[in-house]
Structures are given as C-alpha cells and as structure tokens.
C-alpha cells in the first residue's frame, strides 16, 4: 500500500507547524509609503487580483527544444510565444510521446502501465483514485515535527563520530575540507537521516545554509555502511532543478572524494540536458556510479531506456530545491520518476527513502510530498523560526529608489563604478529580468568599469556556462551579470554584494538572489535599484516573507552621467527596441501579482527608450498591432503613451512599412 505524508494533517505534537505560510508583522514600515507617496490601502493585495488571461511574455530565454533545466522562471499561468512557455498544468513530459508508458525493454506491458500510472491520475495511488483530492487515498504516514527550538544541543562532527553516527573515514574527509562547525540544517538532519532508516525526511532551511552537505554526508555514510552491496550499483538519485545546480552538487561530491581515497570507490555521475546522451551512458557503464545527479528531463530519458540496467538497487532519492522544481513545472515529472524508481526496485516498491529539501513549504510542496513518500513515518525538520525573516540575517539589505526605471540603470552603473574601484577584491552578482537586458548591461559594463565581467543566462550553451561558473568561482574579483538562472543553489565563494535592477520573476526569488552572499557564516550585502512605482513589491515581501528593508536611499540622476552613458551605448535603435520590449513583456506578466499600477509602470519602462537616446519625446516605433498583440496590449489605451504606432495602410497595401524589429519572429 502506498504511504503518504501530509504536512496539513498532523497530531497535537506538531500543531506548531499548522500555519505553513509565513506572515510578517502587521505593522508595515512607513518608509516604503513615504517614498511611494500614497496610502497603503490604495493597493490591492495579491489575492484580490484576478488572473488576466491576456498577460503574455516574450520567451527570450527559452530554446527551440524544451530542456529539463529551462531558465525562463515563469509562473505556470503565463504565456509565451511559439509554444515554448509553460502553460497551466504543463509538464515537460508533454513533449515526449513515449512517457505514458515504460519502454518494453524495462519489462512492462505498455497498456497495463498506462492504466496503473496514468499521468491524468492526480493522486497516483495504486488503487486508481482519480478524484483529484488534495490528500490521496492510502495510509497516512506518521508525522514527527522537529522544530528549530526543540533542542539547544550543538551537534558537531566530533559528537557524531563519538556516537558512531559517522565513520572515521567520513569524519576525516569532512574535517580536511576545513569545516569549523555544522550549520543548523546539518545539525538537525544528518543524524536523523542516518539513524532513522525507516523514515522519509522533509527539511526546510534558508538558502545558503548548507543543505547540500546535509544530504551528501548521510548518503556517503550509507554507502560506507553497505560497502559490499553498494559498489558498482546506483544507490542514490539526486534530482536538481537546473543543470548548473546539478553540476555544482557533483563538484561537492568530488571534493569529498579528494579528501579520502576510500570514498573514491563510490563514483558519481551527472545527467543533465545540453550534454551528449550517448557519451553519458558510456560513462555510466564505465565507472558504475553509486550516486547519480540529474535534472528531471534527462533522468527520465535515461531511466526509460536503461532503467533495468542501472536503477534497480536505489536506496535514496533526494529532491534538492523542491520548491524550485515545482515552480518550473516539474511536479508530474517528479511523480513519474518516483513511480519508475519504485517499480524498478528489486527490494520492494516502498524500499526507497525520500529526502526532500526546500527553502519554502507551500501547498505545492505538500502535495508533492503526498505523491512521493514511501515510508510509514516522515520526519519534518524545520530550521526556520516562523517569526524570523526568511532572508539571511547576516545580509545588509538596501533599496536605492529613483524616479524612473531609467534611473535604475544609472544608479547601478554609478554604484559598480564606485565600489568596484575602491573595494579590494570586489566580487559581485548583478541580477536582471531578461536575457536581452542582461546582454545589454554586460556590454555596457565591460566599457564602463575595469572589472572582469561575466555574462550568464539560459541562452548560453551548457559547456560555456560550466566554464563561466568554474572561472567565476576561482576569481578574486569580478562581476557576474545574470538572469534568475543564477538565483538558486549556485555557491560562489566570497561574494561581496548582490545587486538587482528591477524585480525578480517570483517573489521568493528575491530571497534566493540575495542568498548568493553571506554564505558559510559570512556577512554580505545586497542593493536593489528600483523606481518608486515598484515599491509595492516590498510591501508584499514583508507581509508574506517577513522581510523588512530599513536602508532606503533616494537616487537623483546627474545629467552629465546620463549624457555620458548615452554616448557609450553603441547599440542600434532596433536593438534597443528589442531590449526595452523584453522588459515590458517581463513586467507585463507579473505586475498585478506585485500590486503595481501597470498604467504607470509600463509607460515608464517604455520611456527608457527615449531617455537612453537623449530624446525624452522619442517613443518606440511600431508598425500596426503586430507587436502589441504579442504583448497582449492591442486593446490597451496606454499603448499610445508608450509607442509611436504607425497605422496599417489601406486594403490595397496591407503590409505597410515595417522596421527590422517588426519583421522578426518570436
């Protein structure tokens, strides 16, 4: 019988975790309101905003082929172009016609498998429940809550060694890596994972607190405990949301290998999109790994073709950044992977233990846990106090508020010029909303500042992305200019500060972005450059995530700075049109969720075009409604404030004049 774990139905022992949604103080910091110049009651909450089906976004970070590590970070209710954007209830499995059934090489009858594990069966229960209820049929797992304040005992590597929780070989390897102390999530999770062999684990911890080692250490200890049985067999499968995070986890495994020769016997292989499939299979056959790390799409491809060969003896499956996996739209893929692993397992369909690590635990993560937990007991380990901010307390956060969106660019460039020059070993990350905007800013900064500038986004091929990550990790100073592809899981040492121009694609991504600094117990800072119209976002951030930013500065652009930047643009008007339109499309898709008045914000972004060209009256030229239709603004009256719209000629010349931009396909 399939067991399930629900965070919503718990005993009185764990009633403290009933309100999983973090709520901040009802007293709102007045400084936001002072800058915005309005009363808070005038803004509607996120829940009051109905979804507008006409909201669309330019898909400028997707690719023609769907990848398991897509980097466009859109919500599932947004629309892209040419069929590339996630849609409601979309799964990457929709692109694979064979994924309703296992390949016959795995020993399954296709029709029987489809009836048993149909992707349309929301509960995935063995009894074939198709009710779609939140709690599937089946026996509920016993839930044990281990809260942050349940124990004040400090757990160290030495204490784990003395209690025989970890072996001498593993202790030596980790000690040689320079670990001074275990982080809270490591102290809470390592011993329960190792000693409670009949329990699944759900762990919640802030970003940048060492979740990777919290599951790698127990995995290695399990491999040591079952050394004879574990060699030359895949015993652990780790699922990561992006290629870069999967490769980073592989690097951490290699570090553990390098400190103890005995641990090298347990090989590791990564399976990610953008790499040669056949070469990966040959490498698995060559090294016979004990640990496989991958993104959902590539894992499914390999398991469908070679499941019986490689994945019959799995003991652990780990979901790292589970909330991020769900944001991208991988819920059905994760349930599908879980079903394949359980069915292929030679021990039993309930043998595999599940370790789920996440920075947030919303209803989506709860629903996923219902589908994939196998054991009769589930330990919920929480390292976050409900009353403390979700952002790392050692990050000094600052808002720089300008009058217009164009001010964001000037303020950021001035800041990087100043601190990049006077700060020794200045190492920073600049986050931007779209790929085109990222390319644009990287080009400008290469001319404006004397720092190594790295451009990083989803349209860069995987080989180059891996090289950029490795180079930036080793650099003592430099600037990484990137989209949200670098917001989660990426561990770059010694980041001085995190910079942001504008807003992230999802509210939690603000927390994950700034989490790239102040890692491993160090301090850091973040500076976000916004216009006054964007301030409501930070009201929601405080209400929903208890994050209050007290340092707020006003930016006043200097005319000579603006003129100097305009002279150094070296970009054609058509290219600038594309850049600004991509930003408009991005904001168009998320403004209502953030409580921002789009009638003020979108024209402000559009006027950046004229500002950068030193002609405030110049608007983006559009021929007809072709682009407006793609933006979902063909019937919006504010379009006339934003664009210079040339009406289509009469019926005898319907095509009419078009700029190069309007001839482009999206």
From Swiss-Prot:
Residues 120-131 have a biased composition (Polar residues). ATP binds at residues 205-212. One of its GO terms (molecular function) is RNA helicase activity. It catalyses: ATP + H2O = ADP + phosphate + H(+). SUPFAM superfamilies: P-loop containing nucleoside triphosphate hydrolases. Residues 1-22 form a transit peptide. Residues 408-560 form the Helicase C-terminal domain. Pfam families: DEAD, Helicase_C. Its main location: mitochondrion. It is found in: Mitochondrion matrix. Residues 38-60 have a biased composition (Basic and acidic residues). GO terms for cellular component: mitochondrial ribosome. ATP-dependent RNA helicase required for mitochondrial splicing of group I and II introns. Also required for efficient mitochondrial translation. PANTHER family: RNA HELICASE (PTHR24031). Belongs to the DEAD box helicase family. DDX18/HAS1 subfamily. This is ATP-dependent RNA helicase MSS116, mitochondrial. It comes from Candida glabrata (strain ATCC 2001 / BCRC 20586 / JCM 3761 / NBRC 0622 / NRRL Y-65 / CBS 138) (Yeast). The gene is MSS116.
């Amino acid at each position: 019988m399939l067991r399930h774990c629900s965070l919503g139905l718990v005993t009185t022992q764990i009633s403290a975790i009933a309100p999983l949604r973090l709520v901040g103080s009802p007293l709102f910091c007045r400084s936001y309101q002072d800058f915005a110049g309005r009363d808070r009651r005038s803004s509607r909450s996120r829940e009051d905003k109905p979804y507008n089906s006409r909201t669309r976004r330019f898909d400028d970070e997707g690719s023609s082929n769907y990848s398991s590590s897509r980097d466009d970070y859109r919500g599932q209710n947004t629309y892209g172009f040419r069929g590339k954007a996630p849609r409601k209830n979309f799964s990457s499995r929709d692109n694979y016609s064979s994924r309703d059934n296992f390949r016959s090489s795995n020993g399954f009858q296709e029709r029987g498998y489809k009836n048993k594990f149909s992707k349309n069966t929301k509960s995935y229960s063995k009894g074939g429940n198709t009710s779609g209820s939140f709690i599937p049929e089946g026996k509920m797992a016993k839930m044990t809550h281990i809260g942050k304040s349940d124990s004040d005992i400090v757990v160290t590597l030495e204490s784990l060694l003395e209690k025989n929780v970890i072996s001498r070989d593993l202790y030596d390897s980790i000690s040689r890596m320079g670990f001074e102390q275990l982080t809270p999530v490591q102290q809470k999770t390592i011993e329960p994972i190792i000693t409670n062999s009949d329990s699944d684990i759900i762990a919640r911890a802030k970003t940048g607190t060492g979740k990777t080692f919290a599951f790698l250490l127990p995995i290695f200890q399990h491999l040591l405990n079952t050394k004879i049985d574990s060699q030359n067999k895949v015993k652990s499968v780790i699922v990561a949301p992006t290629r870069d995070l999967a490769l980073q986890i592989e690097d951490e495994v290699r570090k553990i290998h390098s400190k103890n020769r005995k641990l090298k016997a347990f090989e590791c292989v990564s399976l990610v999109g953008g790499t040669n499939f056949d070469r990966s299979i040959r490498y698995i056959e060559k090294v016979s790994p004990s640990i496989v790390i991958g993104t959902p799409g590539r894992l499914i491809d390999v398991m469908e073709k070679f499941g019986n060969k490689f994945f019959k003896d799995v003991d652990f499956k780990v979901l790292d950044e589970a909330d991020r996996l769900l944001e991208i739209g991988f819920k059905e893929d994760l349930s599908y992977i879980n079903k394949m692993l359980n069915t292929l397992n030679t021990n039993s369909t309930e043998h595999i233990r599940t370790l789920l690590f996440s920075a947030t635990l919303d209803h989506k993560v709860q629903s996923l846990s219902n589908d994939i937990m196998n054991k009769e007991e589930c330990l919920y380990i929480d390292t976050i106090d409900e009353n403390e901010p979700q952002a790392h307390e050692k990050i000094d956060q600052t808002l720089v508020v300008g009058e217009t969106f164009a001010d964001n660019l000037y303020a950021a460039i001035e800041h990087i010029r100043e601190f990049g020059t006077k700060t020794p070993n200045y190492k920073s990350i600049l986050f931007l909303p779209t790929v085109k905007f990222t390319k644009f800013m990287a080009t400008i900064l290469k001319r404006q500042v004397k720092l190594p500038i790295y451009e990083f986004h989803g349209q860069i091929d995987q080989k180059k992305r891996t090289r950029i990550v490795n180079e930036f990790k080793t650099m003592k100073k430099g600037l990484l200019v990137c989209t949200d592809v670098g917001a989660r899981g990426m561990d770059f040492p010694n980041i001085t500060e995190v910079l942001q121009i504008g807003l992230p694609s999802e509210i939690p991504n603000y927390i994950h972005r700034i989490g790239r600094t102040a890692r491993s117990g160090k301090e850091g800072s973040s500076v976000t450059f916004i216009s006054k119209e964007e301030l409501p976002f930070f009201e929601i951030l405080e209400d929903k995530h208890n994050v209050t930013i007290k340092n707020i500065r006003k930016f006043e652009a200097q005319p000579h700075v603006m003129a100097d930047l305009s002279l150094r643009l070296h970009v054609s008007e058509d290219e600038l049109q594309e850049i600004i339109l991509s930003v408009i499309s991005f904001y168009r898709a998320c403004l209502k969720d953030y409580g921002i008045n789009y009638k003020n914000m979108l024209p402000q972004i559009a006027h950046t075009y004229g500002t950068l060209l030193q002609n405030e009256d110049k608007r983006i030229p559009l021929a007809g409604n072709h682009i407006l239709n793609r933006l979902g603004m063909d019937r919006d009256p504010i379009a006339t404030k934003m664009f210079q719209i040339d009406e289509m000629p009469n019926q005898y010349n319907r095509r009419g004049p078009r700029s190069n931009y309007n001839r482009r396909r999206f």
